[in-house]
């Protein structure tokens, strides 16, 4: 069996509801007169954030900023959102279906503004009004989000809120790890804004979730290959599966060759650490 391990060395924090945490970030940032910039994956995560924002407005979890603008600035996210809006009951959970049955659009609310053209995108940063900006790519490696970072990283009143995993070597990871100077479009940018993270929102299961999935097999796997994680995490999760649950587990590095028919390794190289950008 091959299993991913993105969060194989930790448990997701579910103590505080994500809606409450997001509302706190919006409140704090708008109170300062800044922009809340959310690097977000275009499909799935952006729509999830819109769902939370609708709930925040409905429950009035942000005060003093009625109708605060929310810009969705990603062509792919806009197309994906349109598809979500056309989906039937089979695509939603019970809570969302109840909203649809009540005539409530689950991912739409007043104040949402769709940015289509590059001119629309540029106009967002020309508008001094405090706002929420959802833009891709989620790890800040490409896309319109990089322009919004250029205009907000240096502002003490703004916030960059990560809502998904940031892979090692990406700009998002460097910001999350606390880097104070980055280069965007050939310009050195000082990072003065607040950097935040919304925990538990990854589409990847944590250690317990992954272990529960493995336990679902009627017959225990003979060998578990652990991949899709940083080197330290894949090694740690493979070790955890062996020592705590009795699996024969292995975290292969790039170039490893295993003969399934013979049940043995043909090539087993050592790992090469990822260099930071």
Locations of the language-model features?
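Acidic/His-rich, metal-assisted hydrolase cores and their charged scaffolds
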Residues: 2-277
């Amino acid at each position: 069996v091959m299993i991913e391990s993105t969060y194989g060395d930790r448990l997701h924090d579910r103590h505080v509801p994500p809606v409450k945490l997001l509302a706190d970030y919006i409140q704090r940032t708008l109170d300062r007169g800044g922009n809340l910039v959310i690097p977000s994956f275009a499909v799935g995560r952006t729509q999830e954030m819109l769902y939370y924002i609708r709930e925040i407005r409905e429950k009035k979890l942000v005060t003093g900023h009625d109708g605060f603008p929310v810009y969705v600035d990603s062509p792919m996210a806009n197309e994906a959102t349109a598809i979500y809006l056309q989906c039937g009951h089979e695509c939603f959970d019970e809570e969302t279906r109840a909203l649809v049955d009540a005539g409530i659009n689950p991912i739409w609310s007043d104040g949402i503004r769709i940015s289509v053209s590059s001119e629309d995108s540029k106009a967002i940063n020309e508008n001094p009004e405090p706002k929420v900006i959802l833009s891709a790519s989620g790890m800040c490696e490409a896309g319109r989000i990089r322009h919004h970072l250029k205009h907000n990283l240096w502002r003490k009143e703004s916030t960059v809120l990560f809502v998904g995993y940031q892979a090692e070597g990406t700009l998002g990871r460097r910001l999350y790890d606390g880097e104070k100077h980055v280069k965007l479009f050939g310009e050195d940018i000082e990072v003065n804004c607040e950097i935040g993270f919304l925990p538990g929102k990854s589409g990847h299961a944590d250690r317990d979730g992954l272990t529960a999935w493995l336990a679902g097999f009627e017959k225990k796997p003979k060998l578990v290959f652990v991949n899709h994680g940083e080197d330290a995490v894949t090694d740690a999760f493979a070790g955890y599966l062996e020592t705590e649950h009795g699996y024969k587990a292995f975290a292969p590095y790039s170039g490893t060759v295993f003969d399934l028919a013979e049940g043995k390794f043909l090539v087993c190289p050592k790992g090469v650490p990822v260099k930071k950008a």
